[in-house]
Amino acid sequence: MCIRDSYYRKTYGEIPLWVLANVLTFGNLSKMFRVFPQSLKSKVSKNFEPLNQHQMEQFLSVLTKYRNVCAHGERLFTYRTVDAIADTPLHKKLSLPQSGNQYEKGKQDLFAVVIAFRYLLPGKDFLEFKRKLIKEIDRVNREVEHISEVELLNKMGFPKNWKNITRYHLN
């Protein structure tokens, strides 16, 4: 970065944000977004329509927590965050179960990460992620005999119809 740093300083007068983003951790990016002025949060969020800045902040917070679980070797599939993502049209379109007015799945669990990815990743990238996730779930089901697929999906917060997530438009 030092050689490139001097190039960017000479060319742009400073290090552009898009260059800096390549060397920041995901947690740093999440924190940086949180302290952006509202106008900048709004501009960034518009690149991920239909998300608003509040939803973007929630997605980044939950994704950061899950990234940390992975990085520190904790158990991923049953992990739940204290933070939750906002209700999205996908929660309703997938007919996720509710308790009162609160969705029981896809808020603080691993399925919340899948929902966030659906909104944040380009369509082609999300389809590749989904394909790999299906393959991994199938592998676990073959290799782990003491837990059924339904039980595994339930522990991760996935509804039975989770694969339908790509059938629906995001807004």
Give the ranges of each region predicted by the language model:
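Active-site acidic/histidine clusters and adjacent loop/turn architecture
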Residues: 9-12
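Conserved small/polar residues in nucleotide/adenosyl-binding loops
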Residues: 1-5
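Long, low-complexity, polar/charged, intrinsically disordered or flexibly structured peripheral segments
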Residues: 14-22
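Polyanionic, low-complexity intrinsically disordered segments
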Residues: 20, 29-65, 72-171
